[in-house]
């Protein structure tokens, strides 16, 4: 059974509020509750998934661990103290009572799914990777270390001390579940004795303490393709947690997070930057040097350029992901007012201002237009 992303299960974004998560869970739980779908295995499975996702995402500490480490961060056998694993409906405590106590009489429990003696696919993992804008634009290879679980080499995954074997659970007879009668409803519940495994370990392994798996770390080289954006996911098949009882391993999802850049702002495939130019260059025109991801480039500034004007350098943006196209670089020029002027500079500016007074509409069209609007406003 594949472990799905908890946010995808509830249909919410990763920045969803607690209230949004609760509303999403209530909607799904009402739709797929076993009492409303007594003969639907699909509804039963979706109800289970929604309950498990809500249990994790409604708890701030568990949610933080899940965001950082994925399913490994909330697997009780991983030593992180969260809920997870291959539980049935049991073990969710307040998550179920909080939502359904007022609907089904409080304290209700439901069960389903096989015990842990069945074959299960390993959990998917998530790794948040920070990269620079240059690395995102050109592509790169990064080495990462991820927390994971591996089969205990001492007991070979049985959880029992070498030389001993787990025994069949006397409570559920190895089924991993027990059935409870509550009023008109017959409800399955994870066995409280073996917690769904169908087995009891009377003499646990002194290395993994009965879990059958131990915490570990592994190093991977991840190829980041050119053009990735913030929040893109790179799937590494089979690099998640190992499966149980011979099941296939899960996948690792590397999520890219691009660091803020000192010069550029990214907008899809396009880049934006601000370039200060002098008053004289704006008025008379000239050539300036601007930065690009490929190095310095020349930009011709036409005469009479205004502050805020945007110049496009085609093909100087970000390469499209898995395509040959490139975005553009949008250069926003900002005309700087000169400061700390010398006496001579002040003299020349005063002379320029005096000359300009004779034809304000010609030399300062925006100012003249504004003055005309003021006259109309005041009835002048």
Curated annotation (Swiss-Prot):
Cofactor requirements of the protein: Zn(2+)
Residues annotated as binding Zn(2+) 1: 152, 155, 205, 208
Gene Ontology molecular function: ATP binding; heat shock protein binding; unfolded protein binding; zinc ion binding
CDD domains: DnaJ (cd06257), DnaJ_C (cd10747), DnaJ_zf (cd10719)
Domain J: 5-70
Free-text remark on how the cofactor is bound: Binds 2 Zn(2+) ions per monomer.
Cystine pairings recorded for this chain: none
Pfam families the record matches: DnaJ (PF00226), DnaJ_C (PF01556), DnaJ_CXXCXGXG (PF00684)
UniProt zinc finger (CR-type) residues: 139-217
Entry binding sites for Zn(2+) 2: 169, 172, 191, 194
Positions annotated as CXXCXGXG motif repeat: 152-159, 169-176, 191-198, 205-212
InterPro entries for this protein: DnaJ, DnaJ_C, DnaJ_domain, DnaJ_domain_CS, HSP40/DnaJ_pept-bd, HSP_DnaJ_Cys-rich_dom, HSP_DnaJ_Cys-rich_dom_sf, J_dom_sf
Gene3D superfamilies to which the protein is assigned, alphabetical: DnaJ domain, Heat shock protein DnaJ, cysteine-rich domain, Urease metallochaperone UreE, N-terminal domain
Keyword match Zinc-finger: yes
Notes on the domains: The J domain is necessary and sufficient to stimulate DnaK ATPase activity. Zinc center 1 plays an important role in the autonomous, DnaK-independent chaperone activity of DnaJ. Zinc center 2 is essential for interaction with DnaK and for DnaJ activity.
Family: Belongs to the DnaJ family.
Subunit description: Homodimer.
This protein's name: Chaperone protein DnaJ
Source species: Laribacter hongkongensis (strain HLHK9)
Chain's gene name: dnaJ
